[in-house]
Each structure stands twice: as C-alpha cells, then as structure tokens.
Amino acid sequence: MPLNLPRHLPAIEILKRESIFVMDDLRASAQDIRPLKIVLLNLMPVKIATETDFVRLLSDSPLQVNVVFVKMKEHQSKNTSLEHLMAFYKNFEDICEENYDGMIITGAPLELMNFEEVTYWEELQKIFDWASKHVTSTLYICWAAQAGLYHFYGIPKYSLAKKMFGVFQHTTNGSNVPLFRGFDSEFYVPHSRYTEIRKEDILKVPRLKLLVESKESGVHIVSARCGREIFMTGHAEYAPNTLHNEYQRDLDKGIQTEIPKNYYKDNDSTKDVLVSWVAHANLLFKNWLNYYVYQATPYDPKEIEFLEDLNVKE
C-alpha cells in the first residue's frame, strides 16, 4: 500500500531498505484519489520502533493511506525525543473534529496497574468514546485491547502467575470471517504480557464475539459491532527480533524471565529466531484494511459518525 507519511519520518528509510514502498506527503499530494485516513495512537515508550512495525504492515496495496500519528497530551515521553514528537505527532485535540476510516491503538507497558491509576486514563477514555463514533474500524492492541474491553464492556483483566512470553499457536472460531480470509487452520502470534482476559467473561457479553484463541495463550481476538471494534491481545505487528530484545532487556535488568516459547531454533537463545507469524500478520492487516476499512467506510468521511455496526459478516 502506498503509504503517505511525513517527510523525514525515520520509518521511511528503514522500510525502503526492506524494499517496502512508501511515499512522502509531497508525492502523495499529486495523486487525485480519496486516500484512506488512518490514525495511529502510539502508547509505546519507544515510538519509532512501533511506528515502523505498523507502517510495515499497512504497506503493499494499491490503495493510498494517509497515516496520522497521535500521542497522549497528558504523558511526557522519556524514551522518544521531543524533536521527534514535535515533528511527527499530533495531540488528540488536533484531530478530534475529523472522522477517520481506521484507527490503531497500540499497547503500553502498564498491565499491572489498575486502569484508573494510569495518569492519562481520562484522556484515553475520551479517545475511546470518540473512536466509537468517528472511526469506521478501530484495532485495539494488547494493553489497549484490555483497556478498551474494560471501558466499553466491563471485562476485567487478571494477573498471570508468570509472563506470557513467546509465539503461540492459534485457531479461529469462524472460517468465514473476512478478517481471516486466506488463513491456514492454525497460525502463530507473538505474546508478551503479564495479564490476561478470560474466555468466560467474553462469552457473558452478547455483543462480543470471540474470534481467535489459543490453548496456551488464551483469548487473542475479540470483535464488537461487526468489526467496528477489534481487540487483539497479541502482537502480530512484532518485528522478528522484538521478543529477543525484550528478553535481553529483562535479563539486563535482573528479571528472571523464561526464554520466549517457540521462538528460537531448538529453544536456544544463542540460535536464530524462527519467524513463524509474519505471513499471517501481513494477511491480517490486509484483510482489515480491505474488508473493515476500505469496503466499509463511506466515501464521504462526514457519514462515518452515522454508522452503527459494520455490514461485515462474522
């Protein structure tokens, strides 16, 4: 997908080296088409890596996508320079008067805190409520999925006895769901978290549909409003070395984290990473953009706020 990104965004050069086509805003402005407008609310501390992960997955389609990066106003980043944030990010108040075709809300390393203890919880709730009316389809990732399910549907999260860490096998609960068109019957997804949401709580809420789960890592994808809200507890967007970097970081901090499961060849951290999730991750995001964004969004963005559920069969 030709992505319209701000000139000089670090992800552009990284992805060009991977032979992924992106265009800057100067070239994109010369194309006389209605681009899809996607918001990326980046809650992660190291923002450049997260930007690159998601931009990589939003690429490789004939449609043009304008990506707008948004940060929390009530949080001061310690791991991303102010210069980068000033150059490439907006605050919520800068975009709240517009409608968008799609939105991605990333995870955040806040799992062991109560939601109400998060310094920007009130601001985040306002963004959740805004997205439910002003965005055609929103992906909530990892902690954001837990936060969104709690905010909208009262679903609690539970602490795990140990970190869910590795790449786990998953199956879908509906072969005809457009989000999984072209998927194999079993596929792998990385997880890295200390908390979980539980199947029995999801099944108590009629408006929620459990789409993907794993025998080992539990609930992965839950849908609401026929795909206007999609909650994903795993990290399909992770680059090959992300879990390795997290593992080394934990060891450097003296945290006795177990080796990520199903990740290294022969489960040996001195050997190569076995990349088993990237093909399905790319297909997942292509399907989301096609069936839940491009085919579902009105041509006139003003009509987005009048949508109820999407007309997507699940």
Swiss-Prot record:
Site (Important for acyl-CoA specificity): 111
Positions annotated as active site in the UniProt record: 142 (acyl-thioester intermediate), 235 (proton acceptor), 237
Residues annotated for substrate binding in this entry: 163, 192, 249
A GO MF term: homoserine O-succinyltransferase activity
Catalytic reaction annotation: L-homoserine + acetyl-CoA = O-acetyl-L-homoserine + CoA
Leader sequence segment: none
UniProt site positions, description: Important for substrate specificity: 192
Cellular component, GO, one term: cytoplasm
Record has Cytoplasm as a keyword: yes
UniProt xrefs under Pfam families: HTS
One of the GO biological process terms: L-methionine biosynthetic process from homoserine via O-succinyl-L-homoserine and cystathionine
EC number: 2.3.1.31
Subcellular location: Cytoplasm
InterPro entries membership: Class_I_gatase-like, HST_MetA, MetA_family
HAMAP family: MetA_acyltransf
Function comment: Transfers an acetyl group from acetyl-CoA to L-homoserine, forming acetyl-L-homoserine.
Protein name per the record: Homoserine O-acetyltransferase
Organism annotation: Azobacteroides pseudotrichonymphae genomovar. CFP2
Gene: metAA
